[in-house]
Swiss-Prot record:
GO terms for biological process: light-independent chlorophyll biosynthetic process; photosynthesis, dark reaction. This is Light-independent protochlorophyllide reductase subunit N. PANTHER family: LIGHT-INDEPENDENT PROTOCHLOROPHYLLIDE REDUCTASE SUBUNIT N. InterPro entries: LIPOR_BchN/ChlN, Nase/OxRdtase_comp1, Protochl_reductN. Belongs to the BchN/ChlN family. Its EC number is 1.3.7.7. Binds 1 [4Fe-4S] cluster per heterodimer. The cluster is bound at the heterodimer interface by residues from both subunits. Pathway: Porphyrin-containing compound metabolism; chlorophyll biosynthesis (light-independent). It holds the Pfam family Oxidored_nitro. It comes from Trichormus variabilis (strain ATCC 29413 / PCC 7937).
Length: 467
């Protein structure tokens, strides 16, 4: 490998660009599927409704567990009673769907007209008998992924502070099952418990698909670490217990608000680890959790080497190439670190917002990766100005630009390879085994262009019309 220049420390800059991202109410798209007994009510205008329909499809026949409470002129001019209107809607939701929790998603409009959702919710909750969680996931945020951050921070307040005393009732219901498993169950339970090391309770936070949750839980189980719970859980009624002194660790880089809430409000201890994205990140995440609990990690070297060996067919396509992040979903630093490990040069990491405390371990790992791979450190640009970025793209001529959807087609028309950053949000990218999916996404535009070149379709030719 030829070293372009001496690796340098990360250089941080802040521009004054506009935020080019989806609205954070899009978090409903994955959270309503994750929390199976929930109902999401977005309180906003027609614009919010159009956005939700476009982002998630109309889904008329699927009977989705989300709805739009559309504000009308009477709401905005204070002619209608907010409480009465919301009560009518929530009673209908309870009658039709009977969820375990209703999540009110505030929007820009509810902020502007100063709608007191937090004041209305407790009173209505008492009347309905269903928990109502209020999350202000409005478009005033930096990135659309922060919608999830807002919802999880609100849900952290609802986590029980001690284990529920419902075991006796459960035992009575399972009496027959107990009889069938007599002489066997206790041994199995004891054997399973003996696989774990004695350590303080650990709760992981971040919404991931169920297969990925299982993978990460099993990876920690191999090290003798028991995961006490996940926030969010599959069901609202199964939210993890959070007592003072519990340890928490995040799986996504955009959850700084949730981390702050868990530390300040619930008095939990945050494990400041890199995020489990890519084999290197997953290994560092597990190692950090192990080090906090005083456990020596076992077999991680072999596990990581095995994964890298399996990725070689993709890595050879991007080794030595350059990538430019325009900034969209706050996953940029983690993806940049992984791509540096794959042999790419990251020219710039644009990011809408950077919480340097929450991402400290990830930033340190990115800097270390650049030094070890012998590539220059990227320029870190917070709140980038897109006009300036486009000029820098013309100057640097990267092999790939990872960008929001708004800029993808204009850049492609100018002969620049692009990849939609939103795809990384919805793909399964966490853990050892899903690293292949990241590279599948990254290499797709490069492979497509190679195929077009093989066919001789790499040039646009304008011909005069023949009459």
């Amino acid at each position: 490998m030829t070293i372009a220049q001496e690796p340098t420390a990360l250089n941080f800059e802040c521009e004054t660009g506009n935020y080019h991202t989806f609205c954070p109410i899009s978090c409903v798209a994955w959270l309503y599927q994750k929390i199976e007994d929930s109902f999401f009510l977005v309180i906003g205008t027609k614009t919010c409704g159009y956005f939700l329909q476009n982002a998630m499809g109309v889904m008329i026949f699927a009977e989705p567990r989300y709805a739009m409470a559309e504000l009308e002129e009477g709401d905005i001019s204070a002619q209608l009673n907010d409480y009465a209107e919301l009560k009518r809607l929530c009673e209908q939701i309870k009658r039709d769907r009977n969820p375990s929790v209703i999540v009110w998603i505030g929007t820009c409009t509810t902020e502007i007209i100063k709608m007191d959702l937090e004041g209305l919710a407790p009173k209505l909750e008492g009347e309905l008998g269903i928990p109502i969680v209020v999350a202000r996931a409005n478009g005033l945020d930096y990135a659309f992924t922060q919608g999830e951050d807002t919802v999880l921070a609100a849900m952290a307040h609802r986590c029980p502070d001690k284990a529920p005393v419902a075991e006796a009732e459960k035992n009575e219901r399972n009496a027959v099952q107990k009889l069938l498993n007599f002489g066997k169950k206790k041994e199995l339970v004891a054997q399973e418990e003996s696989e774990y090391v004695d350590h303080p309770p650990l709760v992981l936070f971040g919404s991931l698909p169920d297969p990925v949750v299982t993978q990460l839980t099993l990876e920690l189980k191999k090290q003798g670490i028991k995961v006490s719970g996940w926030l969010p859980a599959k069901r609202f009624t199964e939210l993890p217990v959070l007592e003072e002194g519990y340890y928490v660790a995040g799986v996504n880089p955009f959850l700084s608000r949730t981390a702050t809430t868990l530390m300040r409000r619930r008095k939990c201890k945050l494990i400041g680890a890199p995020f489990p994205i890519g084999p290197d990140g997953t290994r560092a995440w597990i190692e950090k959790i192990c080090s906090v609990f005083g456990i020596t990690p076992q077999g991680l070297d072999e596990r990581e080497a095995q994964i890298w060996a399996g990725l070689e067919d993709y890595v050879k396509l991007i080794r030595g190439k350059s990538v430019f992040f325009m900034g969209d979903n706050l996953l940029e630093v983690s993806l940049a670190r992984f791509l540096v490990r794959c042999g790419m040069t990251v020219q710039e990491v644009g990011i809408p917002y950077m919480d340097k405390r929450y991402q400290a371990a990830e930033l340190a790992m990115l800097e270390k990766a650049c030094q070890e791979m012998g590539v220059p450190s990227p320029k870190m640009v917070e709140k980038p100005d897109n006009y300036n970025q486009v000029q820098r793209i013309y100057d640097l001529k990267p092999d790939l630009v990872i960008t929001g959807m708004a800029h993808a087609n204009p850049l492609e028309a100018r002969g620049i390879n692009t990849k939609w950053s939103v795809e990384f949000t919805f793909a399964q990218i966490h853990g050892f085994t899903n690293a292949r999916d990241i590279l599948e996404l990254v290499t797709r535009p490069l492979r497509r262009n190679n195929n077009l070149k093989d066919l001789g379709w790499d040039k646009l030719v304008r011909e005069e019309a023949k009459i």
